[in-house]
Amino acid sequence: MDINSTSPLNASPQPDSPPPANASAFAHQLSGFQYSPPHAADSLLPQVEADSPYLDTRHPYSQYLDSAYPYPSPCEWQHDLYTRTRERSPHPSEQRPHARVLQGAPEHDQDQHLEAAGPREGSWQVGPSRSGPSQAGLSPSATPLNPSPPPHATDLETKHPYSQYLDWANPSLLDWQQDLHTRATASPAPLTAERGRSPQPSEQQPHARALQVPEYDQDLIWQRVDAAGPQAGPWQVGPSHSGPSQARPSHAWPSSSAGAEPAELSDFVMDSGVRAWDHWFLAPHMASEDQMSMLRATGLMPTAEVPTTTFLMMGMRHVAEFRGEGVIRIRPSVDFDI
Protein backbone atom coordinates (compact mmCIF):
# COMPACT_ATOMS: atom_id res chain seq x y z
CA MET A 1 0.00 0.00 0.00
CA ASP A 2 1.29 3.42 -0.90
CA ILE A 3 1.14 5.67 2.15
CA ASN A 4 1.55 8.76 0.00
CA SER A 5 -1.55 8.02 -1.99
CA THR A 6 -4.60 10.09 -1.27
CA SER A 7 -7.98 8.68 -0.61
CA PRO A 8 -11.19 9.90 1.04
CA LEU A 9 -10.36 7.83 4.15
CA ASN A 10 -7.02 9.37 5.03
CA ALA A 11 -7.11 12.75 3.33
CA SER A 12 -10.22 14.34 4.72
CA PRO A 13 -12.46 13.70 7.73
CA GLN A 14 -15.46 14.35 5.51
CA PRO A 15 -16.17 11.46 3.14
CA ASP A 16 -18.17 13.63 0.77
CA SER A 17 -15.31 16.11 0.16
CA PRO A 18 -13.88 15.97 -3.39
CA PRO A 19 -10.40 14.51 -3.81
CA PRO A 20 -7.57 17.03 -4.29
CA ALA A 21 -6.49 17.76 -7.81
CA ASN A 22 -2.76 18.08 -7.15
CA ALA A 23 -0.20 18.08 -4.35
CA SER A 24 -0.69 21.74 -3.40
CA ALA A 25 -4.44 21.24 -3.06
CA PHE A 26 -3.81 18.18 -0.93
CA ALA A 27 -1.46 20.12 1.37
CA HIS A 28 -3.99 22.91 1.66
CA GLN A 29 -6.73 20.45 2.50
CA LEU A 30 -4.48 18.69 5.07
CA SER A 31 -3.54 21.93 6.82
CA GLY A 32 -7.17 22.88 7.08
CA PHE A 33 -7.93 19.51 8.73
CA GLN A 34 -5.18 19.87 11.33
CA TYR A 35 -6.18 23.34 12.55
CA SER A 36 -9.93 23.10 12.18
CA PRO A 37 -11.82 22.93 15.53
CA PRO A 38 -13.32 19.52 16.26
CA HIS A 39 -16.98 18.84 16.37
CA ALA A 40 -18.88 18.96 19.66
CA ALA A 41 -19.53 15.22 19.51
CA ASP A 42 -15.82 14.41 18.96
CA SER A 43 -14.56 16.48 21.97
CA LEU A 44 -13.31 14.28 24.85
CA LEU A 45 -12.90 17.14 27.40
CA PRO A 46 -15.92 18.77 29.05
CA GLN A 47 -16.70 22.28 28.09
CA VAL A 48 -15.45 24.84 30.62
CA GLU A 49 -17.13 28.07 31.65
CA ALA A 50 -16.79 31.16 29.56
CA ASP A 51 -14.67 33.03 32.14
CA SER A 52 -11.96 30.34 32.28
CA PRO A 53 -8.52 31.78 31.44
CA TYR A 54 -7.74 28.59 29.55
CA LEU A 55 -10.78 28.74 27.23
CA ASP A 56 -8.83 30.03 24.25
CA THR A 57 -5.96 27.57 24.52
CA ARG A 58 -8.09 24.65 25.70
CA HIS A 59 -5.64 23.49 28.33
CA PRO A 60 -6.38 19.85 29.23
CA TYR A 61 -6.20 20.59 33.02
CA SER A 62 -8.11 23.86 32.96
CA GLN A 63 -11.05 22.45 34.90
CA TYR A 64 -8.81 21.24 37.73
CA LEU A 65 -6.87 24.50 37.87
CA ASP A 66 -10.10 26.47 38.06
CA SER A 67 -11.40 24.37 40.95
CA ALA A 68 -8.10 24.73 42.85
CA TYR A 69 -8.47 28.53 43.02
CA PRO A 70 -11.94 29.42 44.32
CA TYR A 71 -11.03 33.13 44.44
CA PRO A 72 -10.95 35.24 41.29
CA SER A 73 -7.17 35.55 41.53
CA PRO A 74 -4.76 33.05 43.13
CA CYS A 75 -2.73 35.94 44.58
CA GLU A 76 -5.55 37.28 46.76
CA TRP A 77 -4.39 35.36 49.90
CA GLN A 78 -5.05 38.37 52.07
CA HIS A 79 -8.75 37.52 52.01
CA ASP A 80 -8.07 34.59 54.32
CA LEU A 81 -9.88 34.90 57.63
CA TYR A 82 -6.83 34.21 59.80
CA THR A 83 -4.65 36.60 57.82
CA ARG A 84 -7.20 39.37 58.13
CA THR A 85 -7.42 38.78 61.85
CA ARG A 86 -3.68 39.02 62.31
CA GLU A 87 -3.30 42.12 60.19
CA ARG A 88 -6.23 44.03 61.58
CA SER A 89 -5.34 46.00 64.71
CA PRO A 90 -8.09 46.30 67.35
CA HIS A 91 -10.07 49.44 67.45
CA PRO A 92 -9.56 51.65 70.52
CA SER A 93 -13.22 51.22 71.38
CA GLU A 94 -12.73 47.44 71.52
CA GLN A 95 -9.77 47.48 73.92
CA ARG A 96 -11.74 48.34 77.05
CA PRO A 97 -15.10 46.56 76.94
CA HIS A 98 -15.63 46.85 80.70
CA ALA A 99 -14.93 50.59 80.69
CA ARG A 100 -17.42 51.12 77.87
CA VAL A 101 -20.05 49.11 79.71
CA LEU A 102 -19.61 51.12 82.91
CA GLN A 103 -19.61 54.43 81.05
CA GLY A 104 -22.63 53.49 78.98
CA ALA A 105 -24.79 52.55 81.98
CA PRO A 106 -25.73 55.78 83.79
CA GLU A 107 -28.07 53.95 86.15
CA HIS A 108 -25.02 52.27 87.72
CA ASP A 109 -22.97 55.43 88.23
CA GLN A 110 -20.66 54.97 91.20
CA ASP A 111 -21.02 58.58 92.36
CA GLN A 112 -24.81 58.37 92.43
CA HIS A 113 -24.62 55.06 94.24
CA LEU A 114 -22.32 56.46 96.93
CA GLU A 115 -24.50 59.52 97.43
CA ALA A 116 -27.59 57.33 97.82
CA ALA A 117 -25.93 54.80 100.11
CA GLY A 118 -24.21 57.27 102.40
CA PRO A 119 -21.24 56.57 104.66
CA ARG A 120 -21.18 53.37 106.63
CA GLU A 121 -19.24 52.39 109.67
CA GLY A 122 -15.99 50.62 108.80
CA SER A 123 -16.41 51.10 105.01
CA TRP A 124 -14.40 52.84 102.35
CA GLN A 125 -15.41 56.46 101.73
CA VAL A 126 -14.99 57.76 98.20
CA GLY A 127 -15.20 61.44 97.44
CA PRO A 128 -17.20 62.93 94.51
CA SER A 129 -15.51 62.34 91.19
CA ARG A 130 -17.27 65.17 89.32
CA SER A 131 -15.43 67.91 91.16
CA GLY A 132 -12.00 66.44 90.46
CA PRO A 133 -9.94 63.31 90.81
CA SER A 134 -11.37 60.63 93.00
CA GLN A 135 -10.20 60.85 96.64
CA ALA A 136 -10.33 57.63 98.64
CA GLY A 137 -9.91 57.30 102.37
CA LEU A 138 -10.70 55.10 105.36
CA SER A 139 -13.58 55.57 107.71
CA PRO A 140 -12.80 56.04 111.43
CA SER A 141 -13.50 52.38 112.19
CA ALA A 142 -11.57 51.00 109.22
CA THR A 143 -7.93 50.12 109.77
CA PRO A 144 -5.28 48.53 107.56
CA LEU A 145 -5.72 45.30 109.54
CA ASN A 146 -9.52 45.35 109.39
CA PRO A 147 -10.54 46.72 105.99
CA SER A 148 -14.12 46.89 104.87
CA PRO A 149 -15.43 46.43 101.34
CA PRO A 150 -16.77 49.25 99.22
CA PRO A 151 -20.54 49.67 99.52
CA HIS A 152 -21.17 48.60 95.95
CA ALA A 153 -19.48 45.24 96.66
CA THR A 154 -21.86 44.07 99.39
CA ASP A 155 -25.01 46.08 98.75
CA LEU A 156 -27.42 43.48 97.36
CA GLU A 157 -30.23 45.96 96.71
CA THR A 158 -28.39 47.78 93.91
CA LYS A 159 -27.65 44.56 91.94
CA HIS A 160 -24.34 45.81 90.61
CA PRO A 161 -23.40 43.82 87.48
CA TYR A 162 -19.90 43.12 88.87
CA SER A 163 -20.88 42.59 92.48
CA GLN A 164 -19.88 38.93 92.52
CA TYR A 165 -16.38 39.73 91.29
CA LEU A 166 -16.02 42.58 93.78
CA ASP A 167 -17.08 40.27 96.60
CA TRP A 168 -14.26 37.90 95.76
CA ALA A 169 -11.83 40.79 95.58
CA ASN A 170 -12.85 42.00 99.03
CA PRO A 171 -10.51 40.49 101.64
CA SER A 172 -12.79 41.13 104.60
CA LEU A 173 -15.41 38.69 103.32
CA LEU A 174 -12.79 35.95 103.12
CA ASP A 175 -11.92 36.37 106.83
CA TRP A 176 -8.22 36.62 106.14
CA GLN A 177 -7.67 38.50 109.38
CA GLN A 178 -8.56 35.30 111.23
CA ASP A 179 -5.54 33.53 109.77
CA LEU A 180 -2.92 32.64 112.36
CA HIS A 181 -0.01 33.82 110.25
CA THR A 182 -1.70 37.14 109.57
CA ARG A 183 -2.43 37.72 113.22
CA ALA A 184 1.13 36.84 114.13
CA THR A 185 2.43 39.26 111.52
CA ALA A 186 0.01 41.99 112.56
CA SER A 187 1.11 41.83 116.21
CA PRO A 188 4.86 41.16 116.25
CA ALA A 189 5.30 42.56 119.75
CA PRO A 190 4.40 39.33 121.64
CA LEU A 191 6.71 37.32 119.41
CA THR A 192 9.57 39.73 119.97
CA ALA A 193 9.02 39.62 123.69
CA GLU A 194 8.89 35.82 123.60
CA ARG A 195 12.16 35.62 121.67
CA GLY A 196 13.82 38.22 123.86
CA ARG A 197 12.97 36.40 127.07
CA SER A 198 15.83 34.17 128.18
CA PRO A 199 14.89 30.74 129.56
CA GLN A 200 14.87 30.36 133.29
CA PRO A 201 17.42 28.09 135.01
CA SER A 202 14.57 25.77 135.97
CA GLU A 203 13.77 25.27 132.25
CA GLN A 204 17.34 24.57 131.16
CA GLN A 205 18.15 21.58 133.35
CA PRO A 206 15.04 19.48 134.03
CA HIS A 207 17.16 16.35 134.60
CA ALA A 208 19.32 18.11 137.17
CA ARG A 209 16.22 19.13 139.10
CA ALA A 210 15.02 15.52 139.09
CA LEU A 211 18.34 14.28 140.46
CA GLN A 212 18.28 16.85 143.24
CA VAL A 213 15.03 15.49 144.64
CA PRO A 214 15.79 13.64 147.93
CA GLU A 215 13.83 10.50 147.06
CA TYR A 216 16.04 9.98 144.01
CA ASP A 217 19.31 10.13 145.92
CA GLN A 218 21.66 7.38 144.78
CA ASP A 219 23.01 6.75 148.30
CA LEU A 220 19.47 6.04 149.51
CA ILE A 221 18.99 3.59 146.66
CA TRP A 222 22.11 1.64 147.60
CA GLN A 223 21.11 1.64 151.24
CA ARG A 224 17.82 0.02 150.30
CA VAL A 225 19.72 -2.58 148.27
CA ASP A 226 21.89 -3.38 151.29
CA ALA A 227 18.80 -3.78 153.47
CA ALA A 228 17.17 -6.12 150.93
CA GLY A 229 20.15 -8.45 150.86
CA PRO A 230 22.68 -9.62 148.28
CA GLN A 231 20.01 -11.21 146.02
CA ALA A 232 17.96 -8.00 145.53
CA GLY A 233 20.45 -5.52 144.12
CA PRO A 234 22.07 -5.31 140.67
CA TRP A 235 25.63 -6.26 139.86
CA GLN A 236 28.17 -3.61 140.81
CA VAL A 237 31.91 -3.58 140.63
CA GLY A 238 33.72 -3.01 143.90
CA PRO A 239 37.21 -1.66 144.60
CA SER A 240 40.10 -3.35 142.82
CA HIS A 241 43.66 -3.69 144.06
CA SER A 242 44.97 -3.33 140.53
CA GLY A 243 43.59 0.20 140.12
CA PRO A 244 42.27 3.13 142.11
CA SER A 245 38.77 3.13 140.58
CA GLN A 246 35.80 2.14 142.74
CA ALA A 247 32.35 1.77 141.26
CA ARG A 248 30.28 1.36 144.42
CA PRO A 249 30.85 1.61 148.21
CA SER A 250 31.88 -1.55 150.00
CA HIS A 251 28.81 -1.65 152.20
CA ALA A 252 26.58 -2.47 149.23
CA TRP A 253 27.70 -6.13 149.10
CA PRO A 254 28.21 -8.82 151.75
CA SER A 255 31.79 -9.76 152.57
CA SER A 256 33.43 -12.91 153.90
CA SER A 257 33.91 -11.27 157.31
CA ALA A 258 32.02 -8.43 158.91
CA GLY A 259 33.54 -5.04 158.11
CA ALA A 260 36.26 -6.44 155.78
CA GLU A 261 36.65 -6.07 152.03
CA PRO A 262 36.50 -9.23 149.87
CA ALA A 263 39.91 -10.41 148.81
CA GLU A 264 41.08 -9.75 145.25
CA LEU A 265 42.38 -13.01 143.74
CA SER A 266 43.16 -11.88 140.19
CA ASP A 267 46.93 -12.06 140.65
CA PHE A 268 46.96 -15.30 142.63
CA VAL A 269 49.40 -17.81 141.14
CA MET A 270 47.87 -21.24 141.00
CA ASP A 271 49.63 -24.60 141.23
CA SER A 272 49.91 -24.72 137.42
CA GLY A 273 52.03 -21.56 137.48
CA VAL A 274 49.51 -19.20 135.82
CA ARG A 275 47.55 -16.37 137.30
CA ALA A 276 43.98 -17.01 138.31
CA TRP A 277 42.57 -14.37 135.92
CA ASP A 278 44.33 -15.80 132.87
CA HIS A 279 42.09 -18.89 132.81
CA TRP A 280 39.04 -17.62 134.62
CA PHE A 281 35.55 -18.41 133.37
CA LEU A 282 33.01 -15.58 133.94
CA ALA A 283 29.97 -17.81 134.34
CA PRO A 284 28.58 -20.14 136.99
CA HIS A 285 30.76 -23.26 137.02
CA MET A 286 32.10 -25.98 139.28
CA ALA A 287 35.48 -25.16 140.81
CA SER A 288 38.50 -27.01 139.47
CA GLU A 289 41.30 -28.47 141.60
CA ASP A 290 43.46 -25.38 141.08
CA GLN A 291 40.57 -23.09 142.04
CA MET A 292 39.81 -25.09 145.20
CA SER A 293 43.52 -25.00 146.09
CA MET A 294 43.41 -21.21 145.65
CA LEU A 295 40.39 -20.96 147.95
CA ARG A 296 42.09 -23.11 150.60
CA ALA A 297 45.29 -21.08 150.41
CA THR A 298 43.40 -17.78 150.84
CA GLY A 299 41.08 -19.09 153.56
CA LEU A 300 37.95 -18.70 151.42
CA MET A 301 37.10 -22.37 151.05
CA PRO A 302 33.38 -22.82 151.89
CA THR A 303 32.41 -25.56 154.32
CA ALA A 304 29.27 -27.00 155.78
CA GLU A 305 29.49 -24.52 158.67
CA VAL A 306 30.23 -21.55 156.30
CA PRO A 307 28.40 -22.50 153.08
CA THR A 308 29.27 -19.32 151.09
CA THR A 309 32.31 -17.10 150.77
CA THR A 310 32.88 -13.99 148.66
CA PHE A 311 35.96 -12.87 146.73
CA LEU A 312 36.84 -10.52 143.88
CA MET A 313 38.16 -11.43 140.48
CA MET A 314 39.29 -8.35 138.54
CA GLY A 315 36.95 -6.29 140.69
CA MET A 316 33.94 -8.53 140.02
CA ARG A 317 32.38 -10.22 143.01
CA HIS A 318 32.16 -14.00 143.00
CA VAL A 319 30.42 -16.32 145.44
CA ALA A 320 31.80 -19.78 146.27
CA GLU A 321 29.06 -22.15 147.45
CA PHE A 322 29.44 -25.45 149.27
CA ARG A 323 27.53 -28.21 147.48
CA GLY A 324 29.11 -31.25 149.08
CA GLU A 325 32.39 -32.72 150.18
CA GLY A 326 34.89 -31.75 147.50
CA VAL A 327 32.19 -30.04 145.38
CA ILE A 328 32.38 -26.23 145.19
CA ARG A 329 30.29 -24.07 142.85
CA ILE A 330 31.57 -20.60 141.84
CA ARG A 331 29.27 -18.01 140.30
CA PRO A 332 29.50 -14.26 139.58
CA SER A 333 27.22 -12.06 141.65
CA VAL A 334 25.19 -11.01 138.58
CA ASP A 335 23.52 -14.43 138.54
CA PHE A 336 21.14 -14.43 141.46
CA ASP A 337 18.94 -17.44 140.73
CA ILE A 338 21.41 -19.84 139.12
Swiss-Prot record:
Protein location: Secreted
Swiss-Prot/TrEMBL keywords: Nodulation, Plasmid, Secreted
Biased composition annotated in UniProt, kind: Basic and acidic residues: 85-97
One GO CC term on file: extracellular region
Compositional bias (Polar residues): 1-14, 126-138, 242-258
UniProt-annotated stretches for the region Disordered: 1-48, 85-158, 187-209, 230-259
Main location: secreted
Functional summary from the UniProt entry: Putative symbiotic effector that modulates nodulation in legumes. When delivered into the plant cell, modulates the activity of signal transduction pathways that culminate in activation of PR proteins.
Name of the protein this chain belongs to: Nodulation outer protein L
Record organism: Sinorhizobium fredii (strain NBRC 101917 / NGR234)
